[in-house]
Amino acid sequence: MKYKHLILSLSLIMLGPLAHAEEIGSVDTVFKMIGPDHKIVVEAFDDPDVKNVTCYVSRAKTGGIKGGLGLAEDTSDAAISCQQVGPIELSDRIKNGKAQGEVVFKKRTSLVFKSLQVVRFYDAKRNALAYLAYSDKVVEGSPKNAISAVPVMPWRQ
């Protein structure tokens, strides 16, 4: 019993700095007689470590009885688009390359083993941030991925 509490506590601590998505909207793709329809969901999140960068992710969400109960596994299909929405402030850790590949967003896409992740890279040569969206599993991930780049530009007032 102690181990369950320890694992749960560590999991919550590790997920703390990740961004939380806000659902912007969705469209139904397949009608289901029982349970919710299959759909494509559009969500937005702000990079938790880079002020004034917002990313939009679209992803498939499985419906039906299993989907309604949270037991279905969503497909690995996703798209991402990130934009500068104000003056960008980069920390020294990001500028020095110590945060390369850092997970900035994670969404569970199956009951236990699968998730959609977004990781950030900083391209110092081009002064740009690159955001990579991909799906992974405990045992095996998917090669499906999407990328969005945000050039770090001066913000006009």
Curated annotation (Swiss-Prot):
Keyword Signal applies: yes
Effect of loss of the gene: No crucial effects on activation of cre regulon gene expression during aerobic growth on glucose or pyruvate minimal medium or during anaerobic growth on glucose minimal medium.
Domain of life, per lineage: Bacteria
Cellular component terms per the entry's GO annotation: cytosol
Coiled coil: none
InterPro entries listed in its UniProt record: Uncharacterised_CreA (IPR010292)
Protein's recorded name: Protein CreA
Keywords: Signal
Keyword Signal: yes
Signal peptide: 1-21
Pfam families in UniProt: CreA (PF05981)
